[in-house]
Amino acid sequence: MSSSISRRRLLQATGATAAVSAAESVIGSSPARAASTAGRADIGVSAHPFAFGQVQLTASRWLDNQNRTRNYLRFVDTERLLYNFRANHRLSTNGAASNGGWDGPTFPFRSHAQGHFLTAWAQVYAVTGDTTCRDKAAHMVAELARCQANNGAAGFNTGYLSGFPESDFSALEAGTLSNGNVPYYVIHKILAGLLDVWRYMGSTQARDVLLGLAGWVDWRTGRLSSGQMQSVLRTEFGGMNAVLADIYQQTGDSRWLTTAQRFDHAAVFDPLASNQDRLNGLHANTQVPKWIGAAREYQATGATRYRDIALNAWNICVNAHTYVIGGNSQAEHFRPPNAIAAYLNRDTCESCNTYNMLTLTRELFTLDPNRVALFDYYERAWLNQMIGQQNPADNHGHVTYFTPLNPGGRRGVGPAWGGGTWSTDYDSFWCCQGTGLEMHTKLMDSVYFSSDTTLIVNLFMPSVLNWTQRGITVTQTTSYPVSDTTTLQVTGNVSGTWTMRVRIPSWTAGATISVNGTTQNITTTPGSYATLTRSWTSGDTVTVRLPMRIIMRAANDNANIAAITYGPVVLSGNYGNTSLASLPSLNTSSITRTSSGSLAFTATANGSTVGLGPFHDAHGHNYNVYWNTSGQ
């Protein structure tokens, strides 16, 4: 989210279900089966993720992250989260305290965070069956329905729902909005949260509120000329095209596709369709959700221009605008192509950008499951930035907004608009806090995919897959990336011949795959998928070994500035509380692993020994990621 203040047919029965409890709409639904069936199949998709609840994390750092976020989701007071909605829609706030930060009663785009909470609660319920999270989501939906039903008394048009007046949209359309609000950004979050409660909890009340609000968007935007709409799109609008395309896919009603396509931003899409990099100077996280929308619009329509936009955007961003940890942007903005070493600052790598790039990567993988580069990037960003985004010392799993890459950087940096260090229970509500809630409640969603009877293994972490469609259970056991080995045991109705495809990352060499201790004679070329086709027996154990080594990753714009990687892991230097005025000069030949039981290394920098460790664990101390290697 930018710190710049300058950037920023109706459905008739929209509020008719306000008296129906959302909790009632999920009674009898098991979390794994509550999701509604989409009305339309995605076009061009040849790999499919497993549903929430089919993959469970087991004891690991990743499960710890999930549990900390779950603690916060169970703790947070829904009455406080409802304060701005109730006040705006002229209902009693029931004596609740108001929030601070980006959800304060006078903050321009207050009420954006609540959609993230809805999504995260629904995900936790779908994954774990947590009824506290289910009930919080149900209560919020019921109260949002009451707010929406009171629009007549509040002076709003049918279907409208948010924490600020509808008049902000009139100002947006007139080009006079100057209070810092990004109103469609907020509407996107609310729509997405309601959609997820419908999909993952089976809540028909969430569906009705969702379609009421979507109907309002259709009415509001349908009155504008194409030129007026493109002017509206100059203000950040999140992933409106993505969520409306999702609603189209969910309902099969072409009205929502028509509405989605009104949010196709020509000034951004046209250059990308021609594979032109014009990202320099653009607010980064304003763009990435649009790219996700292009991918979803391709899957909804089959129009290859949308696919090209999404794919070109991914290639341009990852290859020319991405730091070694997988994040992008400095001060929330894209810089010139390949400008990496030139922008090693305290305000690099806004968390939202990386979260959304992971979403885009996942969508593109479903279209091209043979392209290993997609999940090589996914793993790099997921592990090095997003796992480390969360403060492991905080039982509520609070997060950093930026991940600093300056010499002697330290996690715990808030946004320019509001400042701070880590997010808090009630006084932050940044965009990155919201996406963090989503991130750390779905860490398991991209470990495995399926393509017909083929199982695809993309990520290596302790987990259990219940492939219920086939009666197969896959148990993955590993200490990766401390170890270079993972095992996958298949049990259940595994008989017959079928294929397991395993990602062989581009950074490895000499990878091996064995079954029940016997090395298999299959191709394990780095940057490919190894294909293991066999007649299976319950209990068969696949062992995957991916040898790791130190590789220096030079910055795109300066061959003498580089980061240290070991397998998928970025290694950073631990400088305690020492400040650094410049990049330390590293003796690259001195890098030595000092423990087989951890990723502990040492090296010589500026003539002194420095400890190195995995960047995702670099907490509570000043660190260094990029090094001066000009003396080597």
Give, region by region, the residue ranges found by the protein language model:
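C-terminal beta-rich recognition modules with glycine/proline-rich loops and embedded aromatic residues
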Residues: 260, 310, 375-389, 394-489, ...
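Well-ordered alpha-helical segments within folded domains of soluble proteins
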Residues: 109-126, 182-198, 233-248, 282-299, ...
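Extended ligand-binding groove/face enriched in aromatic
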Residues: 99-103, 125-262
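N-terminal secretory signal peptides and thylakoid transit peptides that target proteins
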Residues: 1-18
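Active-site neighborhood of glycoside hydrolase catalytic domains
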Residues: 237, 246-270, 287-325, 353-356, ...
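Low-complexity, Ser/Thr/Pro/Gly-enriched N-terminal "stalk/linker" regions
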Residues: 19, 24-25, 35-113, 138-171, ...
